[in-house]
Amino acid sequence: IIWKDIDYMFIDMPPGTGDVALTIMQSIPVQGVVMVSTPQPMVSMIVEKACHMCEKMEVKVLGIIENMAYLECPNCHERIEFYKKEDVETLCNSTCTKLYGTLPMLDLIRDINEYDAYSKEQQEKVDAYISDIATEVLEDIA
């Protein structure tokens, strides 16, 4: 594929340190990687291994986004921590990376592929969760 002049390319890859990640890092000039984790020890371990692989490949890990970090009550919007909060903090410390932010478990995000288009209200709800994270990532790669 030949792309015209582009500023940024985001590639969503499968988790881990498999052939896909290695091939991309060897084939494309990668300026940085944003890892996405969930607050579970096994996932944190996989992300930590991927961070170490990036280090060996001399690819900078910009930071970590914690996905599915908590539930939000639909009535009162109280944040319900389902997993231990320490997992992502330990991961960031062990990989010397920063935490860009956390995202809740949202049915709207879960069902994103089922919508042809978001309503304005749905888009605003998703934007409220990701806009600060996206802004910080873009600032770091600019």
Residue ranges and their predicted role:
Residues 1-4, 26-29, 56-57:
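Conserved catalytic network of the ASCE P-loop NTPase/AAA+ motor domain
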Residues 53-142:
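C-terminal lobe/tail of nucleotide-utilizing enzymes
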Residues 32-41, 45-64:
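Helical hairpin unit composed of two closely spaced alpha helices linked by a short loop
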